[in-house]
């Protein structure tokens, strides 16, 4: 009876260890093979076009609860790059509180991204009608993060809790927006967390192997 219990404990430990080792190995592989030189995992370039004044993401509620005195910026960093396909026009990319951005685009015609399909790649946009022209985005003070100018433009943002949305516009706030954008995310805790899982998996595997050995 004791050997049976030891065998069951050993088998359970081996299964748990396998999960920990696979999880840790996967995180380390992603951190090594899928990140660029700055540690970001990037999307493919995405082309977006509208005849309206802006293209926005839907509002996203971000909630981060970190135990202990850990800087939120170490959890994840968002990086968005964009370039106007008209080489003579500057691009504006901005991240702001959803309420602030909604107020800025009130009564302004813009398109909102409502769905992204990976295979085959497809972006679904919904048009919000309006009759007003927006004020120049670079003159606004509510942006959490932004970048603008001719050629490729990039901003990075250490993720914080709140309700946010992203907007893509022409720098001069004119209608007819056509841009190419890339989104990247960096998760610094991925490597140490993956390493911790591997260590824990190794310890549990030793325990499981010992139990199985005692049961034989």
Give the label of every model feature segment.
Residues 1-8, 190-216:
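Juxtamembrane interface at the cytosolic side of transmembrane helices
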Residues 1-35:
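Hydrophobic secretory-pathway targeting helix
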Residues 10-13, 17, 24, 162, ...:
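Glycine-centered flexibility sites
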Residues 33-184:
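Extracytoplasmic/periplasmic regions of membrane proteins
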Residues 173-196, 203:
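C-terminal edge strands of extracellular/lumenal beta-sandwich accessory domains
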């Amino acid at each position: 009876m004791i050997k049976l219990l030891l065998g069951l404990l050993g088998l359970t430990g081996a299964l748990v260890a396998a999960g920990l080792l696979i999880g840790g190995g996967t995180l380390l592989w992603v951190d090594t093979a899928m990140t660029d030189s700055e540690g970001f995992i990037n999307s493919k370039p995405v082309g977006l076009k509208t005849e309206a004044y802006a293209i926005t993401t839907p509002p996203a509620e971000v909630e981060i609860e970190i135990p202990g005195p850990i800087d939120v910026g170490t959890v994840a960093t968002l990086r968005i790059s964009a370039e106007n396909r008209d080489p003579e026009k500057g691009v504006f990319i901005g991240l702001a509180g959803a309420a602030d951005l909604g107020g800025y685009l009130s009564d302004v015609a813009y398109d909102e991204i409502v769905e992204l399909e990976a295979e085959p790649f497809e972006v679904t946009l919904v048009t919000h009608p309006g009759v007003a022209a927006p004020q120049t985005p670079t003159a606004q003070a509510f942006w959490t993060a932004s970048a603008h100018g001719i050629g490729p433009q990039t901003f990075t943002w250490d993720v914080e809790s709140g309700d946010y949305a992203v907007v893509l516009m022409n720098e001069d706030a004119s209608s007819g927006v056509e841009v190419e954008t890339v989104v990247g995310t960096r998760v610094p805790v991925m490597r140490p967390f993956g390493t911790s899982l591997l260590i824990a998996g190794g310890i549990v595997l030793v325990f499981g192997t010992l139990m199985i050995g005692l049961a034989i």
